[in-house]
Amino acid sequence: KSLKGQFHQDWNFNIVKTGEKLNLGDKELIFVETPMLHWPDNMICYLTQDNMLFSNDAFGQHYATSAIYNDLVDQNELFVECLKYYSNILTPYNSKVIKKIEEILSLNLPLDMICPSHGVIWRDNPTQIVELYLKWAQNYQENQITILYDTMWESTRDMAEAIAKGIKEADSQTVIKLIHLSKKDKNDVITEVFKSKAILVGSPTVNKGILTTIASLFEFVKSLEFKNKQAAAFGSFGWSGESVKLINAKLTDSGFA
């Protein structure tokens, strides 16, 4: 219906489902439905003989590079972009990621290349990104605590820095990320939240509320349905002083313990 609506053509559609094949002569395309990875109508297909998986949105990146293949780009940069993509887009679908990857692996198809819809093509050890997806889908976290804050007159920043110092003194092995939200891209922020075992969120009170940078972040965070992460709120006293109570309520509403 969607294609007909866009192109106004009454083509002879052949609607395929998981396990169906399209004969191309000496090769076949094998189809697997992957709904919500990350669109409802997603599907991947596998090209026999060439052992290529056209993975649609899975295993991709929002990564601008003139190189086509994964072995031709900076590896650290590539995997940062892979993690950012997963964190910001696929986190709510962790259980579906595991289920679909296991379904694909159960087909026992040889795999020489993974071609996502966007980002580099995986030709060097293509299953490495599959293994990472399985790892990330297990409610992933590192030994990291992220402190997120915004500030008006620097007092909330002073609190954030004092908290970071206290954590470091208590546990020097824990990685601490201190992020001033108004100076950081939201997708990078979400990636750090994804990696963290705990977050702390701070804001002063403004008009009986919290700063808009903090409020808008929670709208995004809630939609990602993070699990098994600890959280706490802080804020410098001012105005009517509701910020900590409001942040705690939003943390609870977003699934943080």
Where do the language-model regions lie?
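Active-site neighborhood of phospho(di)ester-bond hydrolases with catalytic His/Asp-centered motifs
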Residues: K1, L53-N56, I114-H118
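Catalytic core of the metallo-beta-lactamase
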Residues: F7-L72
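Conserved hydrophobic helix-helix packing surfaces used for dimerization/oligomerization
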Residues: L29, M52, I145-I147, A231
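Short hydrophobic segments within beta-strands
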Residues: S55, S117, L148-D150, I179, ...
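FMN-binding flavodoxin-like domain, especially the glycine-rich phosphate-binding loop
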Residues: T65-Y69, D74-I114, G119-I121, A162-K177, ...
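Terminal amphipathic helices with adjacent charged low-complexity linkers/tails
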Residues: D112, P116-L148
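Glycine-rich phosphate/diphosphate-binding loop of Rossmann-like nucleotide-binding domains
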Residues: T156
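Short acidic loop-to-helix transition motifs that present clustered carboxylates
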Residues: L181-N187
